């Protein structure tokens, strides 16, 4: 993602990409995401046919700054043609603003080192040996806090029966998605709320770690937050640091770009929703040695199909 991002920072409005792509989905979801997250046209010209045992899928296309396909040659040889409007002002309300002060750690490039050697020898928190494990995600759209609470408990019990070690539930699953400050205040849950004790007991009983989203209240302030409930009884909270325009109506921004959580099966990086569009944040978590990105998210009706 750094190439398109740098091109956009230098003022490019159109990204022209000759491709050797053999992914089955065409146009690729990756192309759509690069267009959406950077607010620029992507013109991707891909090869078609077989060469030396490789099947190139074709699917050349033109994608607008909203991530919508405006022209595509889905199969075989051919040309995709479209008019593009460089005066188009894409809707950026669902893309959080960047916070460069949180990304200073990106200058510490650890990739020249073998990951295991670096983190065992120099890191303040050495990596644990990774393990193969089962994880689960659930799509839940509750209408209120009570309904969401029951759905979460059912999901935890089901994950436990399946032998899953990690369960990731949606953003704001406890309470719902607020439109304004007043709604958020009604949905808010404190860290000392009895709901966490009950859910933690269920988590320990089912031997599964659970990550879910909710509105956090603390000292009269509200955050879009994630709760990480671990099977050892510990609880961890992440306050979303990159807010959309809608979220900024009611939420404070957190002070950390992502949360790092060590578990016996690997190191987890936690983000929330549209923060995945801010490419610096998952890169930071990768630099910190995360094996897994857990991203509770809520449906975004403004995103075209194919964009995460």
Q: Language-model segments: what does each one mean?
A:
Residues 10-11, 38, 65, 206:
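Short, structured coil segments at secondary-structure junctions
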Residues 44, 60-62, 80-82, 212-214, ...:
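Short beta-strand scaffold segments in enzyme catalytic cores
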Residues 10-12, 131, 161-165, 208, ...:
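Short, high-confidence coil segments that cap the C-terminus of an alpha-helix
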Residues 21-40, 145, 149-240, 246, ...:
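Cys-nucleophile CN-hydrolase/nitrilase-fold catalytic domain and related Cys-dependent amidase chemistry
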């Amino acid at each position: 993602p750094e190439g398109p991002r740098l091109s956009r920072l230098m003022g490019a409005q159109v990204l022209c990409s000759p491709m050797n792509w053999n992914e089955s989905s065409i146009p690729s979801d990756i192309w759509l995401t690069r267009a959406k997250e950077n607010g620029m046209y992507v013109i991707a010209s891909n090869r078609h046919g077989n060469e030396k045992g490789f099947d190139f899928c074709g699917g050349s296309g033109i994608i607008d700054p909203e991530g919508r396909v405006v022209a595509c040659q889905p199969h075989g040889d051919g040309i995709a043609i479209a008019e593009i409007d460089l005066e188009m002002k894409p809707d950026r309300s669902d893309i959080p603003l960047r916070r460069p002060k949180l990304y200073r750690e990106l200058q510490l490039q650890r990739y020249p080192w073998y990951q295991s050697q670096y983190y065992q020898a120099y890191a303040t928190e050495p990596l644990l040996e990774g393990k193969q494990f089962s994880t689960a995600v659930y799509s839940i759209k509750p209408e209120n806090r009570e309904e969401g609470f029951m759905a979460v408990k059912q999901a935890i019990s089901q994950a436990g029966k399946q032998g899953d070690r990690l369960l990731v539930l949606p953003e704001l699953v406890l309470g719902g998605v607020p439109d304004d400050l007043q709604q958020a205040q009604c949905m808010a849950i404190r860290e000392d709320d009895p709901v966490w004790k009950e859910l933690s007991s269920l988590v320990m009983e089912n031997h599964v770690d659970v990550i879910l989203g909710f509105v956090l209240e603390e000292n009269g302030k509200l955050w879009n937050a994630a709760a990480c409930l671990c099977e050892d009884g510990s609880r961890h909270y992440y306050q979303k640091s990159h807010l959309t325009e809608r979220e900024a109506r009611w939420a404070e921004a957190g002070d950390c770009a992502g949360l790092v959580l060590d578990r016996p099966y690997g190191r987890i990086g936690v983000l929330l929703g549209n923060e995945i569009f801010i490419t610096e944040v998952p890169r930071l978590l990768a630099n910190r040695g995360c094996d897994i990105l857990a991203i509770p998210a809520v449906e975004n009706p403004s995103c075209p199909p194919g964009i995460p």
